Amino acid sequence: MEQRHITGKSHWYHETQSSTTEYDVLPLVPEAAKVSDPFLLDVILEKETLAPFLSWLDPARVLAVDLFPDQLTVTRSQTFTAYERLSTALTVAQVCGVQRLCNYYSARLTPLPGPDSTRESNHRLAQITQYARQLASSPSIIDNRSRQHLNDVGLTAWDCVIISQIIGFIGFQARTIATFQAYLGHPVRWLPGLEIQNYADASLFADESLRWRSSYEVEKLPEEHTKSSTAELCQLAEILSLHPISLSLLEKLLNSTRGNTQPDNQLAALLCARINGSPACFATCMDSSNEYKKISTLMRKGENEINQWADRHSVERATVQAIQWLTRAPDRFSAAQFSPLLEHEKSSTQIINLLVWSGLCGWINRLKIALGETY
């Protein structure tokens, strides 16, 4: 598929090692931090265009502020600093390659005082950066060893919930911005050298009887604090309740996008889980899907088999192509993938909701992978 590729000097280098300098380092685009919309980052859209999406845009905007305060009090159980939060956000933004996002988080991060330049601090930041990059770009490789690396550098269970929520949120934000930019017909811009995300290995989906469990032991809370109104968060609610604000806002996001349910939503959820390597999310979706149960075996296979099936179904082909591009390479998602969806009697509002839903599915996939394991 032909893409417009524009390159220049708008690149970002994220240093993971602290150092002292005799001068202040400035972000490439310092004004990027000054936005009126902390979620869409001032993508130019009419109020009338955004009106149908306020039910999920409002909680997303609140999350964008809550997850990234300028100042933060650190405790023994909550050690993840404001600098580490924004550093993680920039790492994920770089993986996604959406320029607007990279400029914003670079400008937010640069003025903050970094950690001291001790070996321990450098090692901690390097481990956090590596984990964020892996969960954002190749989520299926995260395992108990990855979680142990975070524990070894002092991250608590609370910290691990926050870093996982941040990684999921930034991926969702990147894909939402990419969707609106494609709707507006903006030409794509991506960093040279960034690889497209691969499909997770099919072997992860071979066992249909797999179950999921949390990798963290947390204090048991009353059921009313840990139950979730959504199937996607039912198993995650107990561990995510360590940070109740983000859990509550994520539930609102899920419920508001579910209010715009389309038949394609199930296909999007299955495809995202398959690409990202979350058999737990795949099973949850398949349990609630009647239309796609008959192709369960096919969906568990590889990219070629899925594309061959989609090529035989014109409606699904456009959906599969769009979801694949947005999930695997949000920086390359453009009108070339958005426009074919309009040819199947869908409104732009329906299409945007579908694509935003797929970005939300990727967030849930990463939470399931990061915070637990299948057995």
Swiss-Prot record:
InterPro entries: AhpD-like. Gene3D superfamilies: AhpD-like. This is Uncharacterized protein YciW. It comes from Escherichia coli (strain K12).
